Amino acid sequence: MNNLRTVSDTKRAFYSIHTRPVNSVYRRVVEELMVEMHLLRVNEDFRYDPIFALGVTTSFDRFMDGYQPENDKDAIFSAICKAQEADPVQMKKDGQRLTELAQSKSAQEMLDWITQAANSGGDELQWQLRNIAQNPKFKYSRLFAIGLFTLLELSEGNITQDEESLAEFLPNICTVLNISESKLQKDLEIYRGNLDKIAQVRQAMDDILEAQKKRREADQAKKEGSDDTPTTEASTPDSEPTSEVSS
């Protein structure tokens, strides 16, 4: 009997954990991330690692930026993880560890750290990277690519803003970790394009909300101005005698 969880199982679990409605504009983001994580976790070659965790947390934070109510974001992330029996606390903790590491290094130092990890291990994080580099069945994913990109983005100098420097670093990282450069480049191109698209959508939404706010303020000012205007009766002095004279 096959007890493998299905996408429908994961979605049902999510909506049973997070019972508040998800803002319709962001529902697709939530469900796509949830499905992507699900398909990876049911793959027999998938192994959880901190770079994947950083990719998940970064993807969620970037694409859910601006979500309202803001207080629901943590609950939604937690429900996404718990729906597929992942630990949201560990996911955030691992992502934060790599974030702090990247922020303390330059891009070259980050590459050197990854290279050392792949060749000889080191601390706990480096041994996990060594396992990735030496695993011929390593299950590469878009979320792993986003995690790698984020390491370079957070490092001193942020070379991701320099296309020439980025083009030099990415092939080296792919070689060190034994992952496909073409897949990584394609996934990052889509990721960056989607970030641009969602930024445009958010700007359009902000413009609409601002226009609605100004219209409400104008309507309110017009109403208040109308309320303050004296009526004709109130402004007319006592009535003069009629022109009709009794004979």
Curated annotation (Swiss-Prot):
Residues 228-247 have a biased composition (Polar residues). GO terms for cellular component: plasma membrane-derived thylakoid photosystem II. Keywords: Coiled coil. Residues 210-226 have a biased composition (Basic and acidic residues). Residues 209-247 are annotated as: Disordered. It comes from the Bacteria. GO terms for biological process: photosystem II assembly. Belongs to the THF1 family. May be involved in photosynthetic membrane biogenesis. This is Protein Thf1. It comes from Acaryochloris marina (strain MBIC 11017).
